[in-house]
Each structure stands twice: as C-alpha cells, then as structure tokens.
Regions:
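Large eukaryotic, non-enzymatic subunits of multiprotein complexes that serve as scaffolds/tethers
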Residues: 1-161
C-alpha cells in the first residue's frame, strides 16, 4: 500500500536520511536516504562494525521497520537487486485483544541495549505503555546481514519520555 509506505496523494514522501561522522576529517556526510512508513516517528541506531549489522530501527503506527544502506526502497519490486540486504524488514506490533481495530498502536520510544560484543536487542514502548522486545536475527554465514526480526510483548509500564 503506497499510502502506508510514505506515498501521499499530494506527492509527499517521508524520508529517512543516514549521515556518517568521520572523526579523522571532522566531517559529516550523507550516506544514504530512503522512504519509510508514513507514521514513522522514532528512531534507534543499531550498532555497526564488529558489534552488529548497523542500520536503523524506525518505530511508527502498528509497525517497526529495520532499514539498512543496502535495502531496496518500498516502491521497488520484491525481486533481489543483488545487494546483501535487499529485502526490507517490517514487523507488526502485537496488539491487545480489546484494543479497537480502527485505532493503531503507536511506538513512541525505542532504545537499543548491548549485552556483549555482537549481541544486542531493542526495547520499544507504545503510547499505551506496553514494552516490547525487538530481536534482529543475523545470518549464520555473514553477521552483518539481518535475516529476521521478531517482536514480543514484555510488560506494561508507565509511559516513558
């Protein structure tokens, strides 16, 4: 659905731009940009290099999306483009049974926590106070390629800022 993936009738597309800081040159450069979900409202950086695959978690209404430099834009076909992360990962947020279907669940906060070198997970909180654990599963052959994303409900806490 083009409307859900950032395409509005007025030609507006919500974009995510990824910038990189080069400490040696004291210079910031734009690495890549892509369109994202229309309801996207919060971001969390994923560790890169030896610590993980790098990229960004984007929280929005009813979904959390993982974006990386090598991923294809949402409007392109689902065929592989030859990049190592050509498939976009979008995972639906678990919903309460009594929550109205007409109202979405908005993710308001995402925080990435590191356990050990190469091991991490993210905690996300909804506007209702539900806390979710977000886990990215990497390929066994190449630890810089994310193959799956899972979200599970942990608890309900007072809303954090």
């Amino acid at each position: 659905d083009d409307a859900e993936l950032g395409q509005h009738g007025d030609g507006y597309t919500k974009q995510l731009a990824y910038y990189e800081l080069d400490l040696g040159l004291n210079h910031v450069s734009r690495r890549w940009a892509t369109s994202t979900l229309r309801s996207a409202c919060c971001l969390a950086a994923i560790p890169g290099g030896a610590d993980g695959p790098s990229g960004v978690l984007v929280g929005g209404e009813d979904y959390i999306e993982y974006l990386h430099e090598g991923m294809s834009p949402p409007s392109s076909s689902s065929s592989s483009s030859g990049t190592k992360n050509s498939k976009r990962l979008i995972c639906a947020i678990p919903r309460r049974e009594l929550h109205p279907k007409s109202k979405g669940v908005l993710i308001t906060t995402i925080s990435v926590l590191r356990q050990k070198k190469g091991k991490f997970f993210a905690l996300a909180q909804s506007e209702l106070g539900d806390v979710y654990k977000v886990t990215l599963q990497m390929s066994k052959e190449d630890k810089t390629v994310v193959t799956h994303m899972t979200i599970c409900l942990l608890d309900t806490l007072p809303i954090g800022n």
